[in-house]
């Protein structure tokens, strides 16, 4: 017969964040590590830092041994109710400008930059032609 697992919300787990009442969430499982605080090899500060939070990344980053993972089962009290997790908004992906658009924009800007030098050269040539005819 399958055993029923109690579900806890993330909000409920978050209220258990003290030295004498410390829960951590790892891989969607909730652990009451209150009685383990003094025994933890990294000290109680490590557990308090992640108390009432999802500590999955911190747990994995620490590189826990197989024995540590087996010891966790002793403190298992239930699972995280995934419906209690806040929804992550969907990311909108915007397409970058196509290379043709970028080239076209550059070409358009180039026209603007050449207007002044070309105008100066044209006026200079016209003035020099006019003065050379008069003399």
Curated annotation (Swiss-Prot):
The keyword Transmembrane is annotated on this UniProt entry: yes
Domain of life: Eukaryota
GO cellular component, one term: chloroplast outer membrane
Membrane topology: Single-pass membrane protein
UniProt main location, coarse: plastid
Positions of heme binding: 40, 64
Domain annotation Cytochrome b5 heme-binding: ranges: 5-81
GO molecular-function terms, A-Z: heme binding; metal ion binding
Keywords: Chloroplast, Heme, Iron, Membrane, Metal-binding, Mitochondrion, Plastid, Transmembrane, Transmembrane helix
Regions that span the bilayer: 113-132
Subcellular location, record wording: Plastid, Chloroplast membrane; Mitochondrion membrane
Pfam families (UniProt xref): Cyt-b5
Keyword 4Fe-4S: no
Family note: Belongs to the cytochrome b5 family.
Quaternary assembly: Interacts with BI-1, FAH1 and FAH2.
Name by which UniProt lists this protein: Cytochrome b5 isoform A
Species per Swiss-Prot/TrEMBL record: Arabidopsis thaliana (Mouse-ear cress)
Gene: CB5-A
């Amino acid at each position: 017969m399958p055993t029923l697992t109690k579900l806890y919300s993330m909000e409920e787990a978050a209220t258990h964040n003290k030295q004498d009442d410390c829960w951590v969430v790892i891989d969607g499982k909730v652990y009451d590590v209150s009685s383990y605080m003094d025994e933890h090899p990294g000290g109680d500060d490590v557990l308090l830092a992640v108390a009432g939070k999802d500590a999955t990344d911190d747990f994995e980053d620490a590189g826990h041994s197989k024995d540590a993972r087996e010891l966790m089962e002793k403190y298992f009290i239930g699972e995280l109710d995934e419906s209690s997790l806040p929804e992550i908004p969907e990311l909108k992906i915007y397409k970058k400008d196509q290379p043709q658009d970028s080239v076209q924009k550059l070409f358009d800007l180039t026209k603007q930059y050449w207007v002044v030098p070309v105008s100066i050269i044209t006026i200079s040539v016209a003035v020099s032609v006019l003065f050379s005819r008069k003399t």
